[in-house]
Amino acid sequence: MSCTTDKLIQKYDALVRKTTEHKFAKELCAGTLKDRSLYIYLSQDLQFFETSLRLICKTTSLAPTTHALITLAKKIGFFSNDENSYFHDCLELLAPSLTKEERDNFDNKAIPGVDAYINFLDELRKDASITWPSLVTSLWVAEELYWRWARDTPRAPGLHWKYQKWIDLHDGEHFQTWCEFLKAEVDKFPVEEVESIFVKVSQFEFEFFESCYNA
């Protein structure tokens, strides 16, 4: 019998694929994504990252087992070091592709499509009624979608580090192990309990790509 996460992926296959096969991901992996587009995406993702990190801290505090608590706590450290360093190094490299006025705008204001996602995560963080099943599902689906595009999208050889590092952060054994941990946690709950948040986050992830690509 299929588990909860497999049932959700199968039921919403079209939604999953339109996100994981988005032209943003395809062009990034092909090494053809414009510097401007990558800058906009990363500047927006950095704003998203800070809100998301606060939510992960809440999720960690509600972990039902010691194993889950330690796993999440370790991941917070990874996010704060490896991923955060990439943001700043890459944004500095890509800065000449936009005017200073454009950079200031994208660095300090979430664009439509991204702002709704950030607001949604902030609501999850602030709402005391949101419990572990919803929180761990929101984290799992976001990470699962990233792992799928990073793992499955054809890559050009010899990619510039601005592309390759972002792919590497979301692929490989370290990320697979992380996603499998989250998947196992979500599978402890019935589809009906986590379906709504799965759909919401999946749609937000698509809109994030779409908004940044077209900005």
Curated annotation (Swiss-Prot):
Protein name: Protein PET18
Cellular component terms (Gene Ontology): cytosol
Organism: Saccharomyces cerevisiae (strain ATCC 204508 / S288c) (Baker's yeast)
Gene Ontology biological process terms in this record: thiamine metabolic process
Family: Belongs to the thiaminase-2 family.
Remaining remarks: Present with 195 molecules/cell in log phase SD medium.
Superkingdom of this protein's organism: Eukaryota
CDD domains reported for this sequence: TenA_E_Spr0628-like
